[in-house]
């Protein structure tokens, strides 16, 4: 099993080191600040980064569905907003799709232009599911009657559901984008159209639900057992939290796996836990396995509250900074430019 750590989600954008001369030329203070930030980031490895307890779980936050909103002609209200219950589904999953119509906010209105006529309901809402080859998968009828997945009758949120069929599933280990075109029409034939979508994902490996933890070289390692159907490259990511539910660290690992059962490690760098001042037991609050052989990646589900560790003491973990050479070198070069 080949293993290579990859950059964490939270810090990925920070690892594109800006041109040294550009930063230094802006202001000496900015260059000095950037150098200080690089030295702070260098305390931790790229595969394990601290997470502020005040922030949302980064894995769960990354899976939040995006709301797409489209007004009528010339910006006429009401605007149609559409979204899904998740950003990815697999064969057999029930996908829920939502739509609502609301007047535009003051910030979205051009006060210098004549106000277009606002259309009135009631509205009939339908959705067309189309795959990335343009093939229609289904036509859906949305409802606002409190039935079949609609949470509350008459609340203005229309709901449709669809069970992902095996007949249209992607090959195992791959995924494809599915678009949904949502149309709302009233009795006057006023129409609102908005586009949403999701990922139809068929991962090549699955988390089994088995985990084990150990202390290794001053860091906490949680191993996850996975069952692999097809050989390929896989990304495992997880968030470690305190017993009180505060996020502490995000860890990622990239591995090439052959078919069969394997244990894959997530290493949470010990200095993060030492500096947090929090002892165990810790919780693997979220974890997900992604098949990364082709684009788009085949996302697996995010499993929450996956594992509780032994009651490690925070003083058992290393107090030594990781000292990332690339970031320390960048900081040194910035500091040299500031002194010129």
Give residue spans per PLM region.
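Aromatic sugar-binding surface patches on proteins
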Residues: 146-167, 258-273
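Proline/serine/threonine-rich low-complexity linkers at boundaries of modular beta-sandwich domains
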Residues: 57-79, 195-203
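Short beta-strand elements
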Residues: 186-215, 293-340
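Gram-negative bacterial Sec-dependent N-terminal signal peptides
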Residues: 1-23
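Extended low-complexity, serine/threonine- and proline-enriched intrinsically disordered segments
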Residues: 103-141, 234-249, 286-291
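Short glycine/proline/serine/threonine-rich loop/turn segments at secondary-structure transition edges
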Residues: 151-153, 166-179, 272-284
